[in-house]
UniProtKB/Swiss-Prot annotation:
Belongs to the CCR4/nocturin family. SMART domains: LRR_TYP (SM00369). It is an enzyme of class 3 (hydrolase). Residues 34-50 have a biased composition (Basic residues). One of its GO terms (biological process) is DNA replication. Residues 30-56, 95-126 are annotated as: Disordered. Its cofactor is Mg(2+). This is CCR4-Not complex 3'-5'-exoribonuclease subunit Ccr4. SUPFAM superfamilies: DNase I-like, L domain-like. GO terms for molecular function: 3'-5'-RNA exonuclease activity; metal ion binding; poly(A)-specific ribonuclease activity; RNA binding.
Length: 696
């Protein structure tokens, strides 16, 4: 063992006979699952910034020969840029960017001997005692936008790098790409003619050396390696680069000297360096897009994904012709304009982040699904009033909207930029009986037990997240629905706040539901119809509306609760909703004082299930290079509703080439959820409207 002057260990195994146990022939290899790292930002939305990677981690390099069959690979990337003459006035010897290229290329050529990098580290460590490693304690890493906490593994993989340099390799074993924990991979000075698309699986790589091979192109999947800081391609036969390299927004050094690179690409890196070339590839990335009316000249870099499958869970209910017995609900966090910045989403082209571009994609998606109810989060006031309310009115939608609490007291122009929750419903199908706003912070301080509870004022009251509640009645069947549209706080440092917000939401819904159970029957249920123009055929008469349903108690009313809860399955907020109670001593409360909620616990009377729980939840609802998890839900009261169909997951093959959203096909970092429900047998009784004494 050799000691180092800093924490952590750097040990490289060069693949010699003395280290055969580290070879690739490992019969039962299990890689550890490492959760993505997020830098916390002082904003309610996810900031996908990457902090500088800590260098004090372990590196053991294991190399052994990889004798295997040639992997299946069909290059398909698009050649970009036309050949033009590079500015002859550039003095390569004086340009700092190209000077660095020449220096790094020279160093690369000196590293052609077998296992050069492993041997170099071994020589540096010779005679130095390495302190035994200690298991790392579990550290929680927050998602900067959505507040989901991902726990690091309690122990780390013992090695994070492989050196296969100078081995004369002509092909790579597919087993190599199962080592998803790798951070450094040296494949330099071999005889590789192609890099398998499976390279995209090694998403933790920050250093990849492919110098001195016979590569003529790179696969599109290279764009999945968004943690790359160094990519060395010296001395190959590469003429062009895939546009997907534009996703490599953290790349600091791209080595291309010794390649017949086309003049356009070479000019960018010579004049302005790696960052400029990556930005060029990102911003010039074509897209295949045909449903947007924005006048763009677009071509295909890869086809859009197949439509998400419509998963039918109950064929009898889903195929029923009685549409009034069913209700479809869509929930979507649209990523508000103020949060969609290059600093948060550096992998996305500027025009993809443009609100004018994204809002049209969102509108088209909403129209294509044509759901009965739409719940949108992160819609600012300006977008609701000036775009979505007007546009969706053409599709028979009426809307209810509230901004977050910070909009109060702002100037009108400033308030337009504050996001909130918007709920739309089909006006021809539903009657709006009531609407309510739940401001979690303001509701908390009005509680009788809030006096003397400092945490309510210091932690909860300062957060202005909200829920919008609408009470609807189906014009034809008389069935009533409570529809909730909520957006919870994201920051994992305030997990107690997120839990208390959930508890307050359920407490307020309990009160509202009891009020709605006593709501009088609706007397005028006829939908507005335009006058028939001359010569226009008669429209078929509507069925006679059924009388309003009455419910014995609030928990009997069908309840649909949608939103971005910023909570993964198994979290405290999730468990409270799903199980109806949570102990007062739950660790997420951290012994803080929140009145009776932290003294006697939290409960609610509803029997709620996650709609997507019927299929074990989706793989994710939020997708970025550093974070992939379930944050969004459609909850339903299982005693009064039955889920009959769901919108499925995003195509897995498509995701092999797309490191994160938003992009040309997905306008938000969240995806839309869509579920179809059927109303179960009536628990209440039918009540005829009382019109008073009638004359004969």
């Amino acid at each position: 063992m050799y000691s180092q002057t800093h924490q952590g260990q750097h040990v490289m195994m060069n693949g010699g006979q003395a280290h055969q146990r580290f070879g690739m022939q490992i019969p039962k290899f299990q890689s550890q699952s490492h959760h993505p790292h997020h830098t916390q930002q002082p904003h309610h939305h996810t900031h996908h910034n990457q902090a500088s990677h800590n260098i004090n981690h372990q590196h053991n390099f294991s190399s052994g020969a990889l004798a295997s069959a040639t992997p299946h690979f069909t290059p398909s990337h698009i050649q970009n840029g036309a050949h033009t003459n590079v500015d002859e006035d550039i003095d390569e010897s004086m340009n700092e960017h190209w000077q660095q290229q020449l220096q790094l290329a020279a160093e690369s050529r000196q590293a052609s001997s077998p296992h050069y990098h492993a041997r170099s580290v071994a020589q540096q460590a010779k005679g130095i005692q390495i302190a035994p490693s200690q298991p790392e304690t579990q550290e929680q890493v927050p998602d900067g936008q959505n507040g989901v906490v991902k726990a690091k593994a309690s122990s780390r993989q013992g090695w994070h790098a492989l050196d296969f340099g100078g081995q004369g390799l002509r092909a790579l074993s597919t087993s190599l790409f199962n080592y998803i924990f790798l951070e450094k991979l040296y494949l330099n000075h071999n005889k590789l003619k192609a890099l398998p698309p499976a390279i995209g699986q090694l998403r933790k790589l920050n250093h990849l050396d492919l110098s001195g091979n016979d590569l003529t192109e790179l696969p599109e999947e290279i764009g999945m390696l968004t943690n790359l800081k160094k990519l060395y391609l010296f001395d190959n036969n590469i003429r062009t680069l895939p546009y997907e390299m534009g996703y490599l927004y953290r790349l600091e050094t791209l080595g291309v000297e010794g390649n017949p690179l086309n003049d356009v690409l070479k000019s960018h890196i010579m004049k302005e360096g790696t960052k400029a070339l990556i930005k060029y590839l990102k911003e010039e990335m074509p897209a295949f897009f045909f449903s947007c009316t924005t006048p763009l000249t677009l071509m295909a870099v890869h086809l859009p994904p197949p439509d998400r499958d419509w998963i039918v869970l109950d064929e009898t209910a889903s195929s029923s012709n009685h549409r009034t017995d069913k209700v479809t609900v869509l929930s979507y966090n649209t990523l508000c304009d103020s949060s969609a910045t290059q600093s948060h989403y550096g992998y996305a082209p500027a025009r993809v982040l443009s609100w004018e571009f994204r809002r049209e994609l969102i509108l088209n998606e909403l129209r294509s699904h044509d759901s009965d109810i739409i719940c949108l989060q992160e819609i600012d006031q300006g977008s609701y009033n000036e775009y979505f309310r007007e546009q969706l009115a053409y599709n028979d939608y009426k809307g209810v909207y509230w901004p977050r609490g910070r909009a109060m007291g702002m100037q009108e122009e400033d308030a337009k930029c504050v996001d909130g929750c918007a709920t739309f419903f089909k006006g021809s199908k539903f009657i709006l009986l009531d609407k309510q706003l739940i401001n979690f912070g303001q509701t908390a301080v009005r509680r009788p037990d809030a006096k003397g509870q400092d945490d309510i004022y210091n932690r909860l009251w300062q957060k202005d997240h909200i829920a919008v509640v609408v009470f609807l009645e189906n014009r034809q069947t008389g069935a009533r629905f409570i529809v909730v549209n909520a957006h919870l706080y994201w920051d994992p440092a305030f997990k107690d706040v997120k839990l208390i917000q959930t508890a307050i939401l359920m407490e307020e819904l309990t009160k509202l539901s009891e009020t709605y159970a006593k709501w009088p029957p609706c007397t005028d249920k006829a939908a507005f119809r335009f006058s028939k123009e001359e010569g226009q055929s008669e429209t078929p008469p509507l069925e006679e509306p059924a009388p309003s349903m009455q419910y014995a108690s609030g928990d009997q009313i069908p309840l649909l609760m949608c939103g971005d809860l910023n909570s993964s399955p198994g979290s405290a907020a999730y468990n409270l909703i799903a199980h109806g109670r949570l102990d007062e001593e739950h660790p997420d409360l951290e012994k803080r004082l929140y009145g009776n909620l932290s003294k006697v616990g939290m409960t609610h009377p509803f029997k709620l299930k996650s709609a997507y729980g019927a299929i074990g939840e989706l793989p994710f609802t939020n997708y970025t290079p550093d974070f992939k998890d379930i944050l969004d839900y459609i909850w339903y009261s299982s005693n009064s509703l039955h889920v009959s169909a769901l919108l499925g997951e995003v195509d897995k093959d498509y995701l092999q080439r797309v490191p994160g959203f938003p992009n040309y096909h997905f306008p938000s970092d969240h995806i839309a959820l869509l579920a179809e429900f059927t109303v179960k047998g009536k628990k209440g009784k039918v009540v005829e409207a009382d019109f008073g004494p009638q004359r004969n």
